[in-house]
């Protein structure tokens, strides 16, 4: 009994210390000198920084392509050894259907000094007769005969890049040479010039698009990529309307007649009308005067934006080909350590609302759900840009399968929702419909690597709908190095993500501001790309899926957490960067997967309620001691 008496004051004192300690910041703070990207740069300075980032992406993608090609050649050697010529033809034909970049393969018999060439049905005979191609293939053949590897520099033929690579078998009796297309470099450059806003995008005049200042809706002209910083884009003959009371069929016919248009497209409580001859301003005046709606706003276009110590044996080092050399982003976010706590769950689905996904990519096999195509509902949500496939790979590429890249989660499934077309852009309507569809079909996390600088109530309604269904919404802030809030990232229901580089500096292109929640890696991130290929891309589009993957891991290890609790937990388990605490350049800091999952293992109580929660626990303990 006497022991209980002296335990009570001891517990009380300990409680006081604990409460004081818990009120102090618990984040790991790392102060590293940060480049002054926030200082207003002239357009030429910003352009040069972005060009440098693009060059890094292209260089990394070039090396990734070569590493992947070498692995393909080794696979071909294993599969074709001992096969007949007909079997080899059949194998190569089938391989080239899924690996179209492997333009030509040569089987080299070193004992006989002979080689046999296999090309796909789409091969161009004149390409093989080109001097550079012939010389490179001859050099590759000579190297194999000498039991040496071969790799040519890149060269251009008719505006397309190629290289030749060859490998001898370990016993020196045969080898394989390949002519490899590097069309992926052209695709990456084209996409990243848009994604990093190095060019005016989208071009005015395409699809009758207007550019306006997001605050005033006054017309502005976008001549350079830098001009996108203060621009939003909308369809000049369309309007989004939310009525105070939904119109009946007769009223819709009346509106259609007044506007010279088809009946409006309806999504939730909102309608989109497209007029054949009226501008947005005329449409806005018509609805404001005649219908007194809740809102009548432009139909905006959205664009892509890509401790308890753990034992050494618990740190997972996957065998994926590109992991050790190119996936700096996973160790930087403590993802490997986090896998010791959770590798995810197939029951927690991440929707990628984007350009679609390459559903046939071998490094995404079994990870992709059927999804939905908003752009063309009759078709599957296949990716015709590359952006969505790259985002999906960051989240859920197969881990430890010996090829390509490792995703952040092992078991979480990706639900592709295609809302952006082949140009990488989409409408408010398509993005909103995609969000609602994902929320209605079981997504627990929605990734939005897209944005615009104008608020759209229509889109906000869709965001609130998903949030009210307990979905964690994660969005990229944008790539214009501006403090201007980007949407949907700046909506209060959305978790906003900006980008860091490998040095934990804010990436030179990354947007910033008081609305930013956290940072995640976004510079030269290696991931999956259409056509069974891989690419390194930069952008807050690449940072956002890191956080979506973390949210999925958190919800996998603790399914009882609400979306708000998941978001609070991620904010409070970061590597603090810059000024201690929250700041506009780094938000709360860079995500720490291990720390977040460690926190999620425990029953989660929001920090502001923790003193009360702790007090209740202590009262319970004291009561138990009194019995």
List each model region and its residues.
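Hydrolase catalytic cores
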Residues: 392-395, 419-420, 444-445, 449, ...
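Active-site core segment of subtilase-fold serine proteases
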Residues: 310-413, 434, 579
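Protease zymogen maturation seam
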Residues: 62-66, 232-236, 290-349, 362-363, ...
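Autoinhibitory propeptides
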Residues: 2-4, 212-230, 253-325, 627
């Amino acid at each position: 009994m006497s022991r209980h008496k002296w335990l009570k004051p001891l517990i009380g004192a300990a409680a006081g210390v604990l409460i004081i300690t818990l009120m102090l910041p618990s984040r790991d703070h790392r102060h590293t000198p940060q480049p002054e990207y926030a200082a207003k740069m002239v357009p030429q300075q910003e352009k040069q920084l972005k060009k440098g980032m693009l060059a890094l992406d292209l260089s990394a993608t070039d090396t990734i392509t070569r590493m992947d090609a070498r692995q393909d050649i080794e696979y071909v050697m294993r599969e074709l050894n001992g096969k007949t010529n007909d079997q080899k033809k059949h194998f190569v034909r089938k391989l080239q259907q899924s690996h179209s970049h492997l333009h030509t393969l040569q089987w080299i018999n070193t004992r006989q000094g002979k080689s046999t060439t296999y090309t796909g049905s789409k091969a161009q005979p004149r390409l093989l007769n080109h001097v550079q191609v012939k010389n490179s293939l001859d050099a590759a053949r000579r190297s194999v005969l000498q039991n040496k590897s071969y790799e040519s520099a890149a060269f251009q033929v008719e505006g397309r890049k190629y290289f030749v690579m060859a490998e001898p078998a370990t016993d020196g009796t045969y080898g394989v040479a390949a002519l490899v297309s590097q069309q992926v470099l052209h695709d990456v450059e084209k996409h990243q010039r848009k994604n990093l806003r190095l060019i005016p995008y989208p071009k005015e005049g395409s699809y009758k698009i207007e550019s306006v200042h997001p605050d005033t809706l006054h017309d502005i002209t976008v001549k350079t990529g830098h001009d996108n910083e203060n621009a939003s884009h909308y369809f000049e003959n369309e309007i989004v309307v939310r009525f105070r009371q939904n119109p009946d069929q007769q009223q819709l016919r009346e509106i259609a007649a007044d506007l010279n248009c088809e009946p409006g497209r309806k999504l939730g409580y909102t309608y989109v009308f497209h007029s054949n001859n009226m501008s947005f301003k005329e449409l806005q005046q018509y609805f404001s005067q005649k219908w007194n709606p809740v809102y009548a706003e432009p139909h905006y276009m959205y664009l892509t934006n890509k401790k308890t110590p753990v034992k050494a044996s618990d740190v997972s080092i996957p065998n994926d080909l590109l992991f050790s050399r190119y996936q700096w982003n996973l160790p930087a976010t403590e993802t490997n350590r986090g896998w010791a706590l959770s590798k995810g769950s197939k029951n927690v689905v991440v929707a990628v609302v984007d350009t679609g996904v390459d559903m046939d990519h071998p490094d995404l096999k079994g990870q992709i759900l059927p999804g939905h195509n908003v752009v063309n509902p009759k078709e599957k949500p296949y990716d015709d840009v590359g952006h969505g496939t790259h985002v999906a790979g960051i989240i859920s590429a197969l881990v430890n399968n010996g090829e390509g890249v490792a995703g952040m989660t092992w078991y979480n499934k990706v639900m592709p929702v295609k809302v952006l077309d082949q140009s990488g852009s989409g409408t408010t309507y398509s993005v909103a419909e995609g969000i609602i569809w994902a929320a209605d079909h079981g997504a627990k996390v929605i990734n939005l690597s897209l944005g615009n600088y104008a608020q759209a109530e229509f889109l906000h309604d869709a965001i609130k709908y998903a949030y009210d269904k307990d979905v964690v919404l994660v969005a990229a802030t944008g790539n214009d190095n501006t403090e201007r809030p980007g949407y949907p990232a700046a909506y209060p229901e959305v978790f906003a993500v900006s980008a860091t580089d490998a040095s934990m500096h804010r990436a030179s292109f990354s947007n910033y501001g008081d609305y930013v929640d956290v940072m995640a890696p976004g510079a030269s991130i290696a991931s999956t790309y259409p056509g069974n290929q891989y690419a390194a891309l930069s952008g807050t589009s690449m940072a956002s899926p890191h956080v979506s993957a973390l949210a999925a891991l958190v919800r996998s290890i603790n399914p009882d957490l609400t979306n708000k609790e998941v978001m609070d937990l991620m904010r409070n388990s970061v590597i603090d960067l810059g000024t201690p605490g929250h700041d506009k350049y780094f938000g709360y800091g860079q995500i720490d997967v291990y720390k977040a999952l460690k926190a999620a293992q425990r029953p989660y109580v929001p920090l502001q309620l923790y003193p009360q929660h702790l007090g209740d626990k202590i009262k319970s303990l004291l009561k138990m001691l009194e019995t």
